[in-house]
Amino acid sequence: MKAWQELTITVHREAEEAVSNLLIEAGSQGVAINDTADYIGQEDRFGELYPAVEQSEMVTITAYYPSSADIDDIRQTINQGLNRLKQCDVELGELTLTNQELAEEDWADNWKAYYEPARITHDLTIVPSWTDYEATAGEKIIRLDPGMAFGTGTHPTTKLSLFALEQVLRGGETVIDVGTGSGVLSIASSLLGAKEVFAYDLDDVAVRVAKDNIALNQATDNIHVAAGDLLKGLTQEADVIVANILADILVHVTADAYRLIKSEGYLIMSGIISEKLDMVKQAALNAGFLLETHMLQGEWNALIFKKTDDLSGVIGG
């Protein structure tokens, strides 16, 4: 019987996607993310709210490697990646890293047990790719393969981004998705009526994952995925730019975003932990944007900025 090696790492929530990416780059065949924040106010499949759980700033990420892989080499590679993240001032918290062997049938079933369909917004529901799910009238389905990494799409930062897209998209827009990761925001943009979506990520793994997830969904031929370093070198104008990435990186997006966004267009920024909110907000204001909406879930923030000369309807306008 073929065995798998299960490696579990506990890190600060802010580093969730960056560390997930490290695990995939080290050869993981799937990643499962357990975050207590995902259950706040969420209903289970029977319509009942999940019981109250103790909240923590830490999340647990579980990765799976073939039995033939050298787990000591993998741990060394991951530790080197974690050290690089520390040098970039990414908050990792008190790290723990453990591993164990797992039988084939346990691997096949265990990681899928983490994931169920989740209604995220009024219109959008995220459904694991293997689930037979029948949509209700008006419900828009985003199919994802969580085993490809980047979680399930139910993290608060993703939820806030989806709420923001639902708020600003009216149909016919051009959208740029910065740091696309799983591709969930690009898929949502298309489902919400965007005419064209351009998705970029610096990481080759993310580009592949996004393309694979987009292929799981209907009517997504209007999504174009490519490798790219934030918005550097782009000339394509957009009505909406959405970026759900680390706050320390968001501050480097605002100037290029202002250059590319059309008049009366929107910049959506998520992934902002509360202690770094003012830093990100000021970077966007300095670039020329006006703040229209501030959304908060737990310690996570999302901001909707508008490129406009009309001060009515904006915060402080």
UniProtKB/Swiss-Prot annotation:
Q: Where in the cell is it found?
A: Cytoplasm
InterPro entries reported for this sequence: Ribosomal_L11_MeTrfase_PrmA (IPR050078), Ribosomal_PrmA_MeTrfase (IPR004498), SAM-dependent_MTases_sf (IPR029063)
Tree of life domain? Bacteria
Q: Which residues form the signal peptide?
A: none
Q: Does the keyword NADP apply?
A: no
Q: Which reaction does it catalyse?
A: L-lysyl-[protein] + 3 S-adenosyl-L-methionine = N(6),N(6),N(6)-trimethyl-L-lysyl-[protein] + 3 S-adenosyl-L-homocysteine + 3 H(+)
Keyword annotations for this protein, in alphabetical order, are:
Cytoplasm, Methyltransferase, S-adenosyl-L-methionine, Transferase
Q: Does the keyword Phosphoprotein apply?
A: no
Provide one Gene Ontology cellular component. cytoplasm
Q: Name any one Pfam family assigned in the record.
A: PrmA
Principal subcellular localization: cytoplasm
| EC top class named in words | transferase
Binding residues annotated for S-adenosyl-L-methionine, in chain numbering? T158, G179, D201, N244
Entry coiled-coil feature ranges: none
Any single biological process term in GO? methylation
Which Gene Ontology molecular-function terms are recorded? Answer: protein-lysine N-methyltransferase activity
Question: Its Enzyme Commission number?
Answer: 2.1.1.-
Entries under HAMAP family matching the protein: Methyltr_PrmA (MF_00735)
Q: Which family does it belong to?
A: Belongs to the methyltransferase superfamily. PrmA family.
Described by its record, this protein's role is as follows:
Methylates ribosomal protein L11.
Please give the name of this protein: Ribosomal protein L11 methyltransferase
Q: Which organism is it from?
A: Streptococcus equi subsp. zooepidemicus (strain MGCS10565)
Its encoding gene is what?
prmA
